[in-house]
Structure formats: structure tokens, C-alpha cells
């Protein structure tokens, strides 16, 4: 069923877009990555602060939190900056919480110590899958921030317990497909975002039927596609981290 679908990009049903992770993209942050999924481009930075939120004071553990935003012309038409409106949208809040949860799932916060890693994901160009690209790139940025702490003698070992990556899947023209771009996302019957660890554990599954309910068989097929795609993304993370892999 998945092999016969005709996708706007010409990709196979189980084929990722071209994915690139460019490390050390900016010079000031402890970790920075430009992540590209086809025409979707997100700048992910990881910054370290030697303090924790008030609710973690005297607990002897660290924290990791995330913020997400889109540049005004990241999409086809310009959007006002949320700062100019004075309020974040519900979508923005949902996505940045998802990014934070995803990364905390693979961090030993006690081993991080009483400090905070701030993840910032800024969408430069959007063509579908910005939240999943953000998670995949943010992990590499966080890894580099941890490496900076180890090199400075502030950490004896890495608090990272596993890799984490994310991908979108959906039912497009009746067939399950991997890594939806905007042309597919805007027309799909089902849209699902899946976050998994390198060991194959599920961190989060967000699935919505866009008018046409999906079956259990379709859900299983989508999860299988996502698992295969995330395995590819984790391998790419390992490849780009190379010798510095924790």
C-alpha cells in the first residue's frame, strides 16, 4: 500500500527528506545546530546558566527547558512577531513544552547538577515538520553544550542517557507516509508526530485525524514508519557527533 503513493516531492512513502545537521553554526552559544529537513530550516541553540528555577532550589539537580519561535517570514506570508503581539500562541507554547519534555527524557537531571540548559529553536524557514526538526537538532545542540561543560571541568560525566529524535508521519492519499512536507501536511487525512529514543522507547505520540478517522492498522503502519525514520535520524546524529559522542 505504501509503495504506490505518488508524493508531490517524488519521494518513496518511507523516505525522509534530505536531512542535514550543521554543528557550531553560531559562535556564542555552548551548543548550536542548523537542522534542515528539506526546505524546513531551524536554528537550535543550547545555552548554559549556572542556576536553576526557584522550584528546584536546594534539590541538587538541574533543569532543561525550551523555547520555540518562527521568524516573521518563515512561512509563505509574513506573520507578526509574537513579542509585538505581547502573547505567545497556544501552538508555540505546546511545541516548546514538547521539545523540553523530549530532551528531558534522555537527561539525568541530577547528574547535570544545579544548572539549566536553555534550548532555543528558531524556525528560519518552514515547510512542514518544524517541531520534529527542532527536537532532532536540539539534541545535538544540547550534546555539544554538555561537552563544553565536561571540557571546562564542570561535569565529570555526561548526563545524557540516550539519543532522542522525532519525525512526522501521516496518511496521504490513503497511504501512510514518512516525513510530511507542507504540501502533504496541508492535505493529509491523518497527521502524527512521534518522538523516540535511540533505544526505541516512545517519548511522545501526537496523532490527529483531519476529518477522516484512521484505523488501528493505519496507526500501526504509521508507528512502524516513524520508528524506521527515527532510527535513520539517530544514526545521523551519531555520525555528525563523531568522536565527541557521549
From Swiss-Prot:
User: What is the uppermost EC class here?
Assistant: transferase
CDD domains on file: RNase_PH_bact
The protein's superkingdom reads Bacteria
Q: Does this UniProt record's set of keywords contain Nucleotidyltransferase?
A: yes
Q: Which Pfam families match?
A: RNase_PH (PF01138), RNase_PH_C (PF03725)
- tRNA-binding recorded as keyword: yes
InterPro entries noted in UniProt: ExoRNase_PH_dom1 (IPR001247), ExoRNase_PH_dom2 (IPR015847), ExoRNase_PH_dom2_sf (IPR036345), PNPase/RNase_PH_dom_sf (IPR027408), Ribosomal_Su5_D2-typ_SF (IPR020568), RNase_PH (IPR050080), RNase_PH_bac-type (IPR002381), RNase_PH_CS (IPR018336)
Q: Which GO terms describe its biological process?
A: rRNA catabolic process; rRNA processing; tRNA processing
Entry keywords, A to Z: Nucleotidyltransferase, RNA-binding, rRNA processing, Transferase, tRNA processing, tRNA-binding
Give its E.C. classification number.
Answer: 2.7.7.56
As its record notes, the protein acts as a catalyst of: tRNA(n+1) + phosphate = tRNA(n) + a ribonucleoside 5'-diphosphate
Where is phosphate bound in this sequence? 91, 129-131
Alphabetized GO MF terms: 3'-5'-RNA exonuclease activity; tRNA binding; tRNA nucleotidyltransferase activity
NCBIfam families per the record? RNasePH
Q: Which family does it belong to?
A: Belongs to the RNase PH family.
PANTHER family referenced in this protein's UniProt entry, alphabetically: EXOSOME COMPLEX COMPONENT, EXOSOME COMPLEX COMPONENT RRP41
Q: What does this protein do?
A: Phosphorolytic 3'-5' exoribonuclease that plays an important role in tRNA 3'-end maturation. Removes nucleotide residues following the 3'-CCA terminus of tRNAs; can also add nucleotides to the ends of RNA molecules by using nucleoside diphosphates as substrates, but this may not be physiologically important. Probably plays a role in initiation of 16S rRNA degradation (leading to ribosome degradation) during starvation.
**Annotated HAMAP family:** RNase_PH
UniProt subunit comment: Homohexameric ring arranged as a trimer of dimers.
Protein name (Swiss-Prot/TrEMBL): Ribonuclease PH
Organism this protein belongs to: Burkholderia cenocepacia (strain HI2424)
